[in-house]
């Protein structure tokens, strides 16, 4: 369902987003 798609996207996006957020903090 929709949550499955969002979860799949999150798994691909989070590894790229987390380092950027960590640098800003």
UniProtKB/Swiss-Prot annotation:
Entry comment describing in which tissues the protein is expressed: Expressed by the skin dorsal glands.
Main location: secreted
Pfam families: Caerin_1
Keywords for the protein's UniProt record, in alphabetical order: Amidation, Amphibian defense peptide, Antibiotic, Antimicrobial, Immunity, Innate immunity, Secreted
Main function: Antimicrobial peptide. Adopts an alpha helical conformation which can disrupt bacterial membranes. Strongly inhibits the formation of NO by neuronal nitric oxide synthase (nNOS) at micromolar concentrations. Acts by a non-competitive mechanism, probably by binding to calcium/calmodulin and as a consequence blocking calmodulin attachment to nNOS.
Organism: Ranoidea chloris (Red-eyed tree frog)
Family the UniProt entry places it in: Belongs to the frog skin active peptide (FSAP) family. Caerin subfamily.
Lineage of the species this protein comes from: Eukaryota, Metazoa, Chordata, Craniata, Vertebrata
Domain of life according to the entry: Eukaryota
Domain notes: Contains two amphipathic alpha helix regions separated by a region of less-defined helicity and greater flexibility.
Protein name (database record): Caerin-1.9
GO biological process: defense response to bacterium; innate immune response
InterPro entries for the chain: Caerin_1
Compartments in which it is found: Secreted
GO cellular component: extracellular region
Sites of Leucine amide modification: 25
